[in-house]
Amino acid sequence: MEKLNKESESDPKNNGPFTQVYQKGWERIRELSKDKQGVVAIPLYSFLAEHIDPSCGAVVADQQFLADKLGVSRSTIKRWLNYLESKNALVRIPVAGKVCAYALDPHEVWKGYNTSKNYAAFVTKTLVNKDGDIQRRIMAMFSN
């Protein structure tokens, strides 16, 4: 992960080490802040926003990895994911076994080029690029 962040910082085309948050993204944060379930799910939403892959707007990880990173149980992550999915804040795309891609709305948060938003995993519900090829370069996060 550190290597990925250093590569992003050194290549100005990758928008550096920041995530763009749009008006709709700030509205999402305010919406999540309105109820108890939303408030506790904000750390997961912000972690995903911070680590989305610029090419597809998703994080590929297993739930245990997310739990370890956020210092909570896997069942808490599962509860937060279900809540965020029910609020249309993220799309869950099964990858293999317990590993999923978690995609955020590119009109809320984004790291890549503006022209690639139409091919974001949140929009297409799959990991593809603008040529229709399955995205194989995506950074995967695992607990092992």
Predicted segments, located by residue:
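Alpha-helical interaction segments
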Residues: E7-G16, D35, L70, R92, ...
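Alpha-helical structural elements
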Residues: K13, P17, V21, V40-I42, ...
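Winged-helix/helix-turn-helix nucleic-acid-interaction surface
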Residues: E2-N5, R79-N144
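Winged helix-turn-helix DNA-binding recognition segment
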Residues: K34, G38-V40, E50-E108
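Short recognition helix of helix-turn-helix/winged-helix DNA-binding domains
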Residues: M1-A58, Q64, M141-N144
